[in-house]
């Protein structure tokens, strides 16, 4: 089903194969991670509450603390963990690593790698930092003005307005 349903906090895809998480985290006012877990469990039939609780502990996040008191990086971590635990095939991410310290960036990258190895999972990551994603992505494309500009290897050294000319004997 390609029809989208919109609620106040997330776009929900009825086919349950995709989970979006935007650049800015969207949580209920005064929500805790536990409350968001319970909400996601209702929306996503395959949501793994036990795994979410384990990951919260692994990432050192207090499940009963109000998310609004978290730092930007901690909010991003909760968003990633919620997305992972939906067990959807695709996780649509916007600026996934923005706000994360280097240790947490590596932890999230490792979590993505583990998910990719253990189940059918594809994170689709939008980022302004190629360096941040080049070590974990199989394919990278550059978007510009609503279209695909190309892949980084083909665009290196190319300036806007320049042409590639091939001449031969």
Question: What is the meaning of each model-derived region?
Answer:
Residues 120-128:
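Conserved H-loop
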Residues 91-95:
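Catalytic Walker B motif of ABC-type/P-loop ATPase nucleotide-binding domains
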Residues 102-104:
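Helix N-cap at the start of a conserved alpha-helix in ABC-type nucleotide-binding domains
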Residues 22-75:
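ABC-family P-loop ATPase nucleotide-binding domains
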């Amino acid at each position: 089903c390609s029809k989208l349903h919109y609620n106040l906090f997330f776009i929900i895809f009825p086919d349950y194969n995709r989970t979006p998480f935007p650049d800015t985290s969207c949580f209920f006012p005064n929500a805790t991670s536990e409350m968001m877990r319970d909400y996601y469990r209702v929306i996503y039939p395959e949501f793994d509450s036990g795994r979410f609780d384990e990951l919260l502990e692994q990432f050192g996040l207090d499940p009963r603390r109000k998310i609004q008191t978290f730092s930007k990086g901690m909010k991003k971590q909760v968003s990633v963990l919620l997305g992972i635990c939906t067990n959807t095939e695709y996780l649509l991410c916007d600026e996934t690593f923005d706000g994360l310290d280097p240790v947490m960036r590596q932890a999230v990258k490792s979590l993505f790698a583990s998910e990719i190895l253990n189940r059918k999972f594809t994170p689709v990551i939008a980022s302004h930092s190629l360096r941040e994603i080049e070590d974990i992505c199989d394919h990278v494309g550059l978007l510009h003005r609503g279209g695909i500009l190309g892949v980084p290897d083909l665009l290196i050294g190319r300036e806007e307005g320049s042409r590639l000319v091939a001449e031969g004997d």
